[in-house]
Amino acid sequence: MTYTFGIELEISGLSQQETRSGLLNRNIKGFKVVNDDSHGVTAEIVSCPMAYGMDAMEQINKVSNALQDMGATIMSNCGFHVHISNAPLMDGVDANDWTRKSIEHFENTGNYYSENLSDPMDAVLIKDVMYRYTKMQNGYNGINSMLPRSRRDMTMARVLVLEKIEAANTIRELQSATHGKFSTINLQPWTTHGTIEFRQAAGTIEADKILHWVRFLLNLIDHSANYRIDQSASREIQHNTPTQPFRRGARVGVQYTMMRAVDGATTRQIMDATG
C-alpha cells in the first residue's frame, strides 16, 4: 500500500516574504510558507500531499536546494514534521501521477488533493505503529539514536507512554493516550486532515535527511500492515479483565462476577443477587 505524505520544514535566517519570493522566483510549486511562533523559527515551509516516487523526490530536492541557495539556516529548536495520510492510495493509482495532480490542485486552489484514497487504516494498525515507535524510542539503534539530544523527550514532541498505548483500543482512546498536539506522534489531525503527524525529527533542509526520515516512517507503517497485522482476521481487540479485583463476598464483587460472565447479567438479576 502507498500512503501519501506531506512535510513541514521550520527554518531560520529568512523571513516569510523572503522565503515565499525565493520559491516563487525559482518556480518551485507545491509548497506554501506560513508563520511559526516557535522561538528562533522565522518561517515554515509546508508541502502539499505527495506520494513517494520520483516526482516527490524531485520536488523535495528542488525546495532543499532553493532554501540552501537562499541562505536558510537551522537552529537547534527547529523541527521537521511529517504528516502521513491515514488512508492509502487506491490500488492501481500511480504514485508519480498522483503527486503531479496534487501539486496542480494545490497551485490552482490552495487546497490539498484527496482523490483516489482508499479507506482509512483502523485502530489496530495505527496502535501497532505507535507501539513500535514508542518501544523503539530508546536503546541501541533506537529512535533517539537517529536524533540529536535536543529532540529527545522535548516539550514540542513529548514521548508517548507505552502502557497508555497498550490500554487503548479505538482511535479516540489512542488520541487520548497521546499528549495532544505536542507528542512524538500527534493524532489530532486524524479527523481534521486525515493524517498522522510525526513531530520528533530535527530541523533540516538537506534533501537526503528529509527523504530518509520519510522513508523510515512509511516503512514503519508498511511493516505493521504487511507483517504484524492479520488483514484477514477479525479486528476485534481482546481485552482481558482481572478475575476478581474486589474482596470475595462483597456486593460489588458479586456484581462484577455476574457482569464478567460470557452472557453478562441483567439489572434485575444483579438486584436479586445483591438485594
Language-model segments: residues:
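Short acidic, hydrophobic short linear motifs in intrinsically disordered regions
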Residues: 264-274
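Short alpha-helical segments that sit at the start of domains
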Residues: 237-254
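Active-site histidine-anchored catalytic micro-motif
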Residues: 75-77
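Short helix-capping/hinge SLiMs at alpha-helix to coil transitions
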Residues: 259-262
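C-terminal accessory/tail domains of diverse enzymes
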Residues: 1-73, 87-89, 93-240
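Basic amphipathic recognition helices
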Residues: 206, 253-256
